[in-house]
Amino acid sequence: MALGGGTWQTQNKVLPGYYVNFSSVPRASATLSDRGYAAAPFELNWGPEEQVFPVTSGDMQKNSKTIFGYGYTDPALLPLREIFTHATTVYCYRLGKGAVKATNDLATAKYGGTRGNDITITVAANVDEDTLWDVSTLVDGAVVDTQTVAKSADLIANDWVTFKTPTLEATAGKPLEGGENVSAINGESHQAFLDKIEPYSYNVLCCPTADPTTVKLYQQFTSRLRDEVGSKFQLVAWQPTTADYEGIIGVWNKATHSSISSVPEHLLVYWVAGAEAGCAVNKSLTNFKYDGELTLDINYTQAELEAALKAGKFMFHNVNGDVRVLEDINTLLTLSDTKGEIFQSNQTIRVCDQIANDTAVLFATKYLGTVPNDASGRASLWGDITKLIQSLNDIRAVENFDPEIVTCEQGDTKKAVLCIVNGLNVVNAMAQLYMSVIIQ
């Protein structure tokens, strides 16, 4: 019989033999997470209902027709182009439910909405085999799918339609008809979106409505998730007059478009949401140039702009013909000993949210229910947290970081750990220059 062998946890083996454990030197797995994630609902006339679906900027550019029903440059996708100007991933949601699908005797549109009325089905005898049929799906007159089959039962659903099973016969083109959009988008539609988006993680939430009651709904959702659930993100909303909170950014400039009529005046919220989501943790949008497609109302005097800043308004203004962000601020107005002026800066909130979110992920994936709450376990947690903050120091999001300001101690119960970071210096971008020149 072979001698004993294998791995060991305690020195309690009976058989003589060789027992060995191999392991690596413990290394902190703490890393800074990427930004660029936004969540937003859209009024669409194509796409799935009542579900959140992530779309990357690459998907948007290459596959927008399949996902949203239109090519990238189509006027119908203006809100999506605005948010994707700087966001890398958007959790999209189609507002409303009950859109009617367009149909004919050959096929039914994959999704409800008026876009289905632009679909046509053609049937032609195959030129090589007279027992086969070429069945094509066209959108705006362009072929998007062709299948060669002997009978309609052999047709496979594509990105645009599901097929019925009539007897095939030649037809130059049968349009789908009867597609209708949702009759009304209201507060319930937005509440349904908020219910669906709650479990997701993102940097910025977009509220694309001018209705004050619905804006307040988004405000309450944001404050609840930030303060009670611990999900750290900021809300971008249109003129949130009652907001006084570092987690809410209020957009006030009205928007129009040079060639697209009936653009909602609040449409700028999409661009701001994407820009705030895509802004790096060590950067600011102060003086950032607007590079979307909208025409913004920037007819403000210096006195009006100063008053707007004091009121916590996120404003754009004219700088030598360019449209730029006046200052990257949120709606926080009421200051206190524990929440001072620095919390009015969105750059500060990005740093705070980065620490909160990354520490939460670190704890949940490495420590929760796994690492003993003893001195060694807390020392490991301390090491990971200090590594996170040191990473922020390395990219100049914070400065003069001393690991000694971080403590991890036994909490009030055996399973609790109390971590305190006392005296962290957050860096903000330069915004004002005061200069004295003395001439002799």
PLM segments and residue spans:
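Generic hydrophobic alpha-helical scaffold/packing signal
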Residues: 386-389, 423
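A glycine- and small-residue-enriched flexible loop/hinge signal that marks low-structured segments
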Residues: 2-372, 376, 381, 388-396, ...
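C-terminal edge-of-domain segments
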Residues: 407-440
